[in-house]
Amino acid sequence: MGSKKLTVGSDSHRLSKSSFSSNKSSHSATKDQPIDTDDIDEDDESGHNIILNIISQLRPGCDLTRITLPTFILEKKSMLERVTNQLQFPEFLLQAHSEKDPLKRFLYVMKWYLAGWHIAPKAVKKPLNPVLGEYFTAYWDLPNKQQAYYISEQTSHHPPECAYFYMIPESSIRVDGVVIPKSRFLGNSSAAMMDGSTVLQFLDIKDGNGKPEKYVLTQPNVYVRGILFGKMRIELGDHMIIKSPNFQADIEFKTKGYVFGTYDAIEGTVKDYDGNAYYEISGKWNDVMYLKDLKQPRSSPKVFLDTHKESPLRPKVRPLSEQGEYESRKLWKKVTDALAVRNHPVATEEKFQIEDHQRQLAKKRIEDGVEFHPKLFRRSKPGEDLDYCIYKNIPVDEDPEKQIRSILQIAPILPGQQFTDKFFIPAFEKIKSQKKMIENEKQNPAKQ
């Protein structure tokens, strides 16, 4: 539909056409391209000794979520913002939405979901753990003159869980998801077992039951190798599952063996629910991926996705001066500023201050018998796919302009938007007031 955007964004925030490999680190920089400290591997002898001291107190299989790690392995980004890495290739979603053939549409969705995994620091870094109630919003000015909107919030701390919402209203595309990383110590490795899933819907494409076509997608797990001996590096491992009403893909992220194998390889098959195989996918998730048409047995695999040739479209975020104290970039600013100049003592102290404040708040909630409630997401109802969903009801068949207004009422997303008193009310209270308003409108239709 491509209606006029509600605000004019800043210059295009595009990354260069380069693959963010998990096993490469470069300290070189030019006058126009300064060093990004997220790309610097600071695993020197003293750093390794710090990690060894922490690890020596652990047993294999124990939970790492309560362990304080040194700041030199932290990325200058909260997990709430890190999720947007998966949303930086909207062109594949738009192509999927316009594709009439269900199998081809499935392949575009698979390409979209595979495209973002290579966006990561070149050094071994982990995102900042969001604090309870932390939130992050962003938007994209798309090439088709439409806008995409993103809202996320840390809904639980033990276990850590963040919920997110993404929508392109004018193209009837909606994404909801939760991320539940469960960290484990495995000897010379640590693992983040990525529970949770992503739910993609094309709201104007109906399945056999007349409901929006839905895709449910899971994540591979993340492993950090070499934490006791050898060089530290990140691997993705285990299986990613993508399911639609008609097809499913099981893609294995293969970890390298001690002797044989290679790093970063993937291997998978696209099938229908009768077991008929249509395509095989292979290659490397941070390099080039190939697709082989199994209905053409003599054909060779063709390039499916070359990560070196794709330019991610980075999200845009409101200025810091407009952000709330629990908004990710503002909350962690002193920490990320210190990390940017590699001042780890200051980063450690600022991080401690934030986390200690959270401990005091948690203690007070226990003393007062008060339960934490998210502001932007609600607990799911029976039968829903995720633990949490955005609290505001956005009707599937509503006019896109009304959908946009509803989204912008949830939280400030665009530059110039102001916080309202309603923003700070827990989501479940907002839902109650919504129901009362709807009931009043039904009882007094003349006042609408």
Swiss-Prot record:
It holds the Pfam family Oxysterol_BP. One of its GO terms (biological process) is endocytosis. It is found in: Cytoplasm; Cell membrane; Endoplasmic reticulum membrane. The keyword Electron transport does not apply. Belongs to the OSBP family. PANTHER family: OXYSTEROL-BINDING PROTEIN, OXYSTEROL-BINDING PROTEIN-RELATED. This is Oxysterol-binding protein homolog 6.
